[in-house]
Structure formats: structure tokens, C-alpha cells
A protein has these predicted regions:
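A bilobed periplasmic-binding-protein/Venus flytrap-type ligand-binding module shared by bacterial periplasmic
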Residues: 57-67, 189-202, 223-226
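C-terminal lobe and pocket-closing loops
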Residues: 149-214
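C-terminal functional modules
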Residues: 207-266
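Extracytoplasmic/secreted envelope proteins and their assembly/folding machinery
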Residues: 9, 13, 32, 75, ...
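Pocket-flanking alpha-helical
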Residues: 7-43, 126, 130-133, 150-155
């Protein structure tokens, strides 16, 4: 098995042009325009939602802040107590789609009038660093992030309830010229595992295995945090997962394979 690091768009482009790779383990379908055409053309088949609860985006506060001030877990509570979140919404850098959406949410919610600044970071690195700095000092923090991610594994966060998502309003919220922005949650992103149709036909057993593989965001966050803390490689992290999550992966495979793998881990 050859593992090729990639991302949704280039991996799908490669499948379209060359028929490879055989398996794409993590396709973020909302950011991959080639996905539906390849499905409709019969070149790929969707096996499962590899992130069972989907990729999540939104506005978050640190766990310690939510525990001290549970009212901050709703946007109404945040806007009623702007000083408790540091009078600031930490936003994505200019050029990122999330910056436009978050700024429109801020406009719709009247953040500025309530005393919450829409602070646009200069880079993704400074956005991430602001979370680490807040955690180190146990200071207020409120802003945009996503999961699964290493940051969410290292710094546990609580998502602020912005109200239900209305798909019909999302296009305007994603437009920097939106005249009627809406206060609402981000949609959950469907993240799937796909295989080429040729691979599914020639490797049914392997396809069945991949169809069973699914993780929660919390599981992925914890694995990323462990890998970072230990300075581990991807292979070492896989061994750690197999050694500590036998109940989970044991549900993915048959009895014979489960016994064989368990013996190797002894």
C-alpha cells in the first residue's frame, strides 16, 4: 500500500485524469467541485461518512470560560456580556471564506453595537496562537475555528449556539457584499471516504473494510493532540490508536482479522 499525502481537490483531479489513487480517505465534499461529476460519471463510489458527525465550523469559547460562565454558550449570552469574552471576536484572515461568513454573522448579530469587535487576524498562525495564549493565561477568547483540528485537541473548546442553520441563507452569508446577512450556525460539512469504481470491483474485501472506518471529531482531535505532544509520526499514531481503541476498530473487521491484529499488538 502506498500512502500519498493530498487534499480533496487535487486527489479528485488525479482520479479524473489518471484513475488514481484507488482510495481517498477524506473528501470534504463542500469544497470539492469535481466530487458530484465524478460520482455521476461512475468513476468513484462513496463508501461512508469518515467523520460521523461531519466537519464542524463555528464560533467557540474555551471550556474553562464556558464552565465559569455557562451563559456564554449562546450568542445572546455573549452579546449581553461582551467583557467576558474580551470584547472581541477572533476572525479568520482576509481571503478565507470563513472570514466573510463570520463577518456577516457579526453584522447580522450587531456585534459591534454590543461591544464585540470583529478582529480579523493577519494569518492563520496568529489566529491559532491567540487561542494558545488565551489558554496559557486562562483569559477570555471568543472566535472562529473548525474541527477536527490539532488546535481543538490541544485546547478544548465549546461551540457557541448561533441558532439553527438555514441553507437558503448561506449563499448570502458567504458573499462579502451580502446586503441581508443572517445570524445562524455554519452547516456541518459532509466528509466521506471514496474509492474508484475499478478498485471496488477488484478489491471487495478492502472496500468493505474502508466502508466501516468512521471516526468522531473528538476522536480525531485527541489523536492529533497526542501526535503533537509525543512528536509522533503518522505510523506511530496509528499504532497508538490500534493499541488504545480496540473496541472501536474491532467493530470494523471480522473475527479472524480482529484476533490476528490483536495478537500483533501484544
Amino acid at each position: 500500500v502506498t500512502v500519498v499525502p493530498s487534499a480533496s481537490t487535487p486527489a479528485l483531479a488525479s482520479v479524473s485524469e489518471t484513475g488514481e489513487p484507488d482510495i481517498i480517505t477524506e473528501v470534504w465534499t463542500n469544497g470539492a467541485p469535481a466530487y458530484v461529476p465524478l460520482l455521476e460519471a461512475g468513476k468513484i463510489n462513496e463508501l461512508t461518512n469518515v467523520l460521523s458527525d461531519g466537519g464542524l465550523e463555528g464560533l467557540f469559547i474555551p471550556v474553562y470560560l464556558a464552565e465559569a460562565h455557562p451563559e456564554l454558550t449562546t450568542i445572546e449570552g455573549v452579546l449581553a456580556n461582551p467583557d467576558l469574552v474580551g470584547n472581541r471576536m477572533h476572525n479568520c484572515p482576509v481571503g478565507w471564506t470563513c472570514q466573510v461568513v463570520a463577518s456577516n454573522v457579526a453584522k447580522a448579530g450587531g456585534f459591534e453595537a454590543a461591544g464585540v469587535e470583529d478582529f480579523v487576524h493577519g494569518s492563520g498562525e496568529t489566529l491559532t496562537a491567540s487561542i494558545g495564549a488565551a489558554y496559557a493565561a486562562k483569559e477570555p477568547w471568543f472566535g472562529y475555528y473548525w474541527t477536527p483540528s490539532l488546535v481543538m485537541g490541544k485546547y478544548p473548546m465549546v461551540q457557541v449556539d448561533l441558532g439553527p442553520h438555514d441553507a437558503s441563507k448561506q449563499a448570502c452569508n458567504s458573499d462579502k457584499e451580502c446586503a441581508t446577512p443572517t445570524m445562524q450556525s455554519w452547516p456541518s460539512s459532509v466528509v466521506t471516504t471514496v474509492v474508484t469504481s475499478e478498485f471496488e470491483s477488484s478489491h471487495p474485501a478492502e472496500t468493505d473494510l474502508m466502508r466501516n472506518l468512521s471516526f468522531t471529531n473528538n476522536m480525531m482531535n485527541s489523536l492529533l493532540a497526542w501526535q503533537d505532544a509525543e512528536g509522533a509520526t503518522g505510523d506511530e499514531t496509528a499504532v497508538y490508536f490500534l493499541s488504545t481503541q480496540q473496541k472501536l476498530w474491532g467493530s470494523w473487521i471480522n473475527d479472524a482479522a480482529r484476533a490476528k491484529l490483536a495478537a500483533l499488538l501484544q
